[in-house]
Structure formats: structure tokens, C-alpha cells
UniProtKB/Swiss-Prot annotation:
Domain HTH gntR-type: 30-98
Organism of provenance: Escherichia coli O17:K52:H18 (strain UMN026 / ExPEC)
Family statement: Belongs to the NanR family.
Pfam families cross-referenced by the UniProt entry: FCD (PF07729), GntR (PF00392)
Region (Disordered): 1-22
Molecular-function GO terms, alphabetical: DNA binding; DNA-binding transcription factor activity
Protein name per UniProt: HTH-type transcriptional repressor NanR
One Gene Ontology term from the biological process aspect of the record: negative regulation of DNA-templated transcription
Top-level taxon in the UniProt lineage: Bacteria
Residue stretches in coiled coil: none
PANTHER family the UniProt entry points to: HTH-TYPE TRANSCRIPTIONAL REPRESSOR NANR, TRANSCRIPTIONAL REGULATOR, GNTR FAMILY
Summary of the function given for this chain in its UniProt record: Transcriptional repressor that controls expression of the genes required for the catabolism of sialic acids.
Gene: nanR
InterPro entries, per database record: GntR_C, TF_FadR/GntR_C, Tscrpt_reg_HTH_GntR, Tscrpt_reg_NanR, WH-like_DNA-bd_sf, WH_DNA-bd_sf
SMART domains in the cross-refs: FCD, HTH_GNTR
Length: 263
């Protein structure tokens, strides 16, 4: 296949500088595992191996690409992270279709890095506001009685968790998850789950007592959201949702400032 020669280094010591500040230097050679990964990925995308079909064994891949076992295993692990193969102990890798969760998961590291920069949290909170605003309007216009009942059940669990902060956070996430499920789009679900995971992970540690009032306020705001959806009033549902998320954002911003002052 010519894989081994795909990125031969060609250092030309006499090559001119590029611009005023860049000196000539050889391009870094790709690792063998990366080259194997790219070749296998192209074969999968060309449907040379169909969904559900097993790839050749590690030994066969080693011989085919003329590389060692570590390179093959690293390549397969990278394909697994991309959702292109599944690997079970004792079995050959099997071709799979990337899920929405896998696609969003690939962005997780970059998202967490972005959140750590100044303004990062505010940008993600704005993204959540725009995203959930569309979800709640859709819910008010299209939610079935069964879906509204699921929201009501999530709200009931919310009310039962007011005095337990860890349980309330879980019930809060579940309430918004039920809302995100209403359109029936798996990509929406993956984005929503990731957004909340990233934002919650970036929140400061706060004493339990300080959270009790916040929990009660959030619960009352959830009631307003469900009431508007039940009445099939998208404008009121949107106002209730935006009021809720803006309140949550302001509260956690205040918690963060208080935490920083104590350091």
C-alpha cells in the first residue's frame, strides 16, 4: 500500500527561510500508529469494511502494514475514541457507526479548556440559553400529554430533593434532560448533556447551606416553565426559561466571586 513511505522526511538544508522570522526545518514525521489509523479510517469510510464487520486480526494488520503490535493497538484505540470501531476483550475490532455522544465527546477536552479561560463560562452559558430557549419553545408547541407528564414527574422529584443538594443537582439535570428529549433528536440530547456536564464541572464548591435558597428558587422557576408548556404558550415558556437560566447564571457568578474573595 506504500504506507511506510507516505511521509518520508525530505530535509533540504539549503531551502530558503519563509518570511522574516521562520527558519527552514524538516516537517515532523507522523507516528506509524497515526498513519495506520488514517489508512484504516479511510478504508472504513470507503465501506471496505461495513458497519458491524470485524477488522482483520492484530497479527494480520501488523503484516499488512508492516508495523509492530503497539502501532496497531494505538491506531485501533484512536479509532475507538472516534466511535468508528468497538473493541471487546478477546475479539477483533468491529466497525461501528459514531453516535452523537461520541461526536460531542471528541470536543470535551477543547470545551473544558475554553471554559477555563476568561469569559469562557459566560460564553457557554449564553450558548445554553440560546439552545434551551429553542427547546422550551418547541416543547410548548409540540409536547404531547405523555411528555408533559414526564416533565411533571421530573418536577416532583425536584421538589423531593430540595433539602439534599447532591440529589437536587441530579434532579435539576434530569428535569432539563427531559425537556431536551422532547424533540426526539439524539444530537440535541448529546449537546445538552455535554453542555451541562461542562458547566457544572466549572462551578465553584459552595457550602450546602448557601445552596438551599438557590434550590428553592430554581424549583419555583421550574414550575413556571412546566405551567407554560402545559398551556402550550411558547412565549411565556421562553420567558420563564430565560428568567430561570439568567437567575442560575447570576447566582453561580456570585458564588464564584465569594469563593475567590475567601482565597
Amino acid at each position: 500500500m506504500g504506507l511506510m513511505n507516505a511521509f518520508d522526511s525530505q530535509t533540504e538544508d539549503s531551502s530558503p527561510a519563509i518570511g522574516r522570522n521562520l527558519r527552514s526545518r524538516p516537517l515532523a514525521r507522523k507516528k506509524l500508529s497515526e498513519m495506520v489509523e488514517e489508512e484504516l479510517e479511510q478504508m472504513i469510510r470507503r465501506r471496505e469494511f461495513g458497519e458491524g464487520e470485524q477488522l482483520p486480526s492484530e497479527r494480520e494488520l501488523m503484516a499488512f502494514f508492516n508495523v509492530g503490535r503497539p502501532s496497531v493497538r494505538e491506531a485501533l484505540a484512536a479509532l475507538k475514541r472516534k466511535g468508528l470501531v468497538q473493541i471487546n476483550n478477546g475479539e477483533r475490532a468491529r466497525v461501528s457507526r459514531p453516535s452523537a455522544d461520541t461526536i460531542i465527546g471528541e470536543l470535551s477536552g477543547m470545551a473544558k479548556d475554553f471554559l477555563s479561560h476568561p469569559g469562557g463560562i459566560a460564553h457557554f452559558e449564553q450558548l445554553r440559553l440560546f439552545f434551551e430557549s429553542s427547546l422550551v419553545r418547541y416543547a410548548a408547541e409540540h409536547a404531547t400529554d405523555e411528555q408533559i407528564d414526564l416533565l411533571a414527574k421530573a418536577l416532583e422529584i425536584n421538589s423531593q430533593s430540595l433539602d439534599n443538594n447532591a440529589a437536587f443537582i441530579r434532579s435539576d439535570v434530569d428535569f432539563h434532560r427531559v425537556l431536551a428529549e422532547i424533540p426526539g433528536n439524539p444530537i440535541f440530547m448529546a449537546i445538552h448533556v455535554a453542555l451541562l456536564d461542562w458547566l457544572i464541572a466549572a462551578r465553584p464548591t459552595v457550602a450546602d447551606q448557601a445552596l438551599h435558597e438557590h434550590n428553592n428558587v430554581s424549583y419555583q422557576q421550574h414550575i413556571a416553565i412546566v405551567d407554560a408548556i402545559r398551556r402550550h404558550d411558547p412565549d411565556e415558556a421562553d420567558r420563564a426559561l430565560q428568567s430561570h437560566l439568567n437567575s442560575v447564571s447570576a447566582t453561580w457568578h456570585a458564588f464564584g466571586q465569594s469563593t475567590n474573595k475567601k482565597k
